[in-house]
Amino acid sequence: MDKVVVITGANSGIGYAAAKIYESKGYFVVLGCRNQEKGIAAEKEIGKNSKFIKLDMTDYESIDNFYNNLTSNFKNIDIFYSNAGIMYVPFSKTKEGLESTLATNYFGSTYLTLMMLDLMKNVVSSRIVQISSIAMYFIKEMRYERLEDESIYSPWTWYNYSNLYRTMFSFELDKKITNFE
């Protein structure tokens, strides 16, 4: 295995398309997917140079298990493609008490990205790709203190916030990481 790419949310949409492209370019593709049935199906469709590993971005234990599985099987990761996300879902909270859209799209993504740095530091050309959307531009005001308040929950607004936070994190991470050597 020469080059390894890890893609979250890899069983459909952008993540699935990226997985197919990377596999066709000779990468070994790790598919991080919440739904086991869909993850296994994606692995079969993408081919022998792929491996499905269960990953639920709302569950820190699942994220830890995913990362531990990676460290057990791979010495280095060349590309981390952080794509997993949810949008426009009814209000719910994770077992940690976080609102689910923010937990998936921002908190879980950030947590895993920070862990992935250790697997990428020895690869000079390593890359982190954070998928976001223009939805962040629809935010009219910031209301940090009310993000867990179900009475004002709006699936659109929380999705917009999650994309803004993800993008802000990416800019801050880029400032802090100048060289893995």
Please report, for each region that a protein language model flagged, where it lies by residue:
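Rossmann-fold NAD(P)H-dependent dehydrogenase/reductase core
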Residues: M1-E181
